Amino acid sequence: MSVSGGNFTEISKDEAKVADKNLSPNGQYLLMNKPVHVKDVAGKDIYKDLPKSDAYVYTSLDYRHWDKYNDGSYNHVFYKDTKTGAEIDITPGQPYYTPQAPFGGDEDYVWDPKGENIYYVSKKLAGTEYAVSTNTDIYKFNLADKKTENITEENKGYDTQPAFSKAGALAYLQMKTPGYEADKNDIIIFENGVKQNLTSQWDGTVNGFLWASNNKDIYFTAPVDGTQQIFKVDYPGKTRKMAVVEQLSQGQFDVTGIVAENNGQLIVTRTDMNHASEIFSFDLKSKTFKQLTQVNNEFYGKLDLPTVEKRMVTTKDGKQMLVWVILPPNFDKNKKYPTLLYAQGGPQSALSQFYSTRWNFQLMASEGYIIVAPNRRGMPGHGVEWNADISGDWGGKAMQDYLDAIDAISKEAYVDKDRLGAIGASFGGYSVFWLAGNHDGRFKTFIAHDGVFDTRAMYGTTEELFFVNHDMGGAYWDKNNATAQKSFKEFNPITYVDKWDTPIMIVQGGKDYRVPIEQGLGAFQAAQLKGIKSKLLYLPEENHWVLQPQNALVWQREFFSWLKETL
């Protein structure tokens, strides 16, 4: 499709190869990745005479991740000769992942412009060390001598997304704080043996980036004020000039990715709460967008869409908090509407103009509900301090932010204060469980999906231990750690179950190893034993998300059925 819009045309395989970043500059090799068996942990591998065994034997952590148990296989990068088909593993026999588990892709490896080296991301730690660390590094593998060099050894946090300019400068993303998965993400340039942080003085965090064709600028996306926008930072090179960050776009939408640059335009993907992702061009001179695809326009034309309003609410401690308020289609301010407080997960995930097929505000509003979606403490896009202000304080300021938001919006005459509900997943589910014991009668119903019910049990069963170590402050057995003890007692939802008295629906995935099954089952069991109206939606084959289409439809039907019944 032309960057000016128009019809689609199918491209050939040869044309696709030209655009394939995994093809070496001279066309001789193709980068690829696949799982390689490195360790024997399955019973049938340890005991060859027991081929039907489904047992596993572990002596350290990293025994499961996201929704899979470790079977002794690790993703490795290979370069394949395009003529002979020969494949060479660049990390043979090593128990390390590239791409990174569980979500990494080919952004984790790249050719240098000369095709002499492969740069790749790996966390070269195993077992328990792997589970408690975020220390991924970027490695350089030389094709000639087969030697590997760690080029980010000095940094003990995340190093990710290596990408070269055509002039040969390497850019990548870096988080400095060990074990902190939601730290400020900076753009680092490595050229001629010198590293330069381009965004250190900017009070934000980078999502993804693209080198400009001039080799001097980098375009990137970042959360800001409840949206995701396009930014530019210049690369000063050998000069002593300070790099300058400039916001290029603004509006009530999310720019979710930068695909390419072409003739003074960026090709991007963009979405908002009422519209699924489409492809746009962005003119770098006029700072304007042009929509190139209209995949769903036929459907939107048949719908009455909700209204999304941006509000600012003063918190109890005097801060200004952005709150999205989604009003039903054909909203009438003279009517009263049941209202839902939406609690975002993460906890350090942006509550921006996203469009979800599950937590879809358009569907909720179309069923006659107002949705209140606060950018509470812990969310990026409001400065590094606001983002960090939830770590070690899950049940503190963030929970008060939720109460401040719903109390402020409930003052509107069109909000039915006798019909308030609270809903959320992951940390949002934790928030619902915590509010269930601390809401002072505000809410008439709750829905918690894969939420943390017992922080102590969570510490003992979740797989990414670096997360709970940082966000909860440490281990529950460390009696001298005041932050940890607060997380496992005062900020633990299970502490307040004696105050539960409100109907609650609980959703739990059977293969959710991030917030494992005992969390949802424990909450449902407590509600049942207390005689509280409650429902469990159990999804045995789903992980932390609901991915199977018919399960997603069951989720939607049960969600709205519960609200209709209890609100």
Explain the meaning of each model-derived region:
Residues 78-80, 294-334:
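N-terminal cap/lid segment of alpha/beta-hydrolase-fold proteins
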Residues 35-83, 87-93, 121-139, 287-298, ...:
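Predominantly five- to eight-bladed beta-propeller fold
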